[in-house]
Amino acid sequence: MGRFINPFTDYGFKFLFGREVEKELLISFLNDLLVGEHVITDIQFLNNEQQPEVKNERGIIYDIYCMTDTGERIIVEMQNREQPYFKDRALFYLSRAITQQAKRGQWNFRLDAVYGVFFMNFVMDKDMPATIRTDVVLSDRATGKLFNDKFRQIFIELPNFNKEEDECNTDFERWIYILKHMDTLDRMPFKARKAVFERLELSLIHIS
């Protein structure tokens, strides 16, 4: 048993990434996830409860739902246990975040981009290559060219990450190392490399 919270519980994950007072942690992680694409400077947490569109349909409660300062809507989920049809569930979640953007009256169908970031403490598809990250976009099947940038899913399969602390070469890998081992750590690694990891430690000490 380590000093820090277990991020694979609903409470632990939302405490880590879902609090307004510590939203810099989520901003930092998202920037390290999307490094080289664009820089997020702020996020606004949105209502994570999505009501059904028609009576008798199922509603959705996201773990974390936010909008960036550049307009992307981002769903962040932690799934601890293996679940059948998880790919379909992820598609359903993003689809609802898209259809909820529809406006009454005159509307030109312009959409905000919707990203889904799915942490999984299991292997999603044993027939696929054992990679830590699977990045899904809408692209042309023949050319591979991006067709529409309004839909993106990033699946992070934690069991496929096997690097030791001194083998982590990027800040994204450092985040994944910390998340995978957090509830067994006695100290927060990588503090000398990036200030956000010290902030992360200070945030978690308050509940340890």
Predicted regions and their residues:
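Elongated, amphipathic alpha-helical interaction scaffolds
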Residues: M1-S208
